[in-house]
Amino acid sequence: QTREDLEAVASKDQKMGARSRYAHVDMSITQEGIHDSPDSVVNNPVAADPLHFYDMCPVSDGAAAVILCPAEKAKAVSQNVPVVIAGFGQATDTHTLQEREDPTDLKAVTLASEQAFGMAGLTPQDVDVAELHDAFTVLEIAESEHAGFFKKGEGGPAAVKGETSLGGKLPINVSGGLKA
């Protein structure tokens, strides 16, 4: 991924998160503001090259809940239309990056995605919106590729072109993700 790819993801996620009153970081930044601002070195310092401040999620607490129950029970206790889980997947890989052939190769994401799509009878092209784990901008890009939404090397350029923004080909992390 290029610096431009990472900045596109960071600014997109901050913009999406700024729309939510529940966001950890409720502000919008632009890609130009990250890169071209005279204060960019101060406001977006290098943390671990090539990652900068806006490439990482803040250390904070949050919560989400999902209630799993039979559809009939859900209809009886909620006015909302129940969501049916069509497929799921689970996989693990070595956590130690130096033990991987390629540190950006996310085999567990590939395997879990293949399981979920197979169970659901769908393909990545059938997905309209995706929420991916994005503690770092590079993860959103790598996961979008390993889940099959983009070919390897095309996730970052897709973000730069706006394909992962609202109104794009595949909006990713419309909540703002972990970074917002």
Positions of the model-derived regions?
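Condensing-enzyme catalytic core mediating Claisen C-C bond formation in acyl metabolism
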Residues: 8-9, 45-115, 161-175, 179
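Short glycine/threonine-rich loop-to-helix capping motif typified by GTGT followed
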Residues: 95-102, 134-157, 168
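Phosphate/pyrophosphate-binding loops at sites that engage ATP/ADP/AMP, CoA/4′-phosphopantetheine
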Residues: 2, 75, 112-126
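Short, conserved beta-strand edge motifs with alternating hydrophobic and charged residues
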Residues: 85-86, 128-133
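Acyl-CoA/ACP chain-elongation machinery
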Residues: 10-24, 93-97, 136-142
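Hydrophobic alpha-helical bundle architecture
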Residues: 120-130, 154, 173-180
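Stable alpha-helical structural segments in soluble proteins, enriched in small hydrophobic residues
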Residues: 65, 108, 112-120, 139-147
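Glycine-rich, mobile lid/loop segments that gate access to catalytic sites or pores
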Residues: 1-46, 50
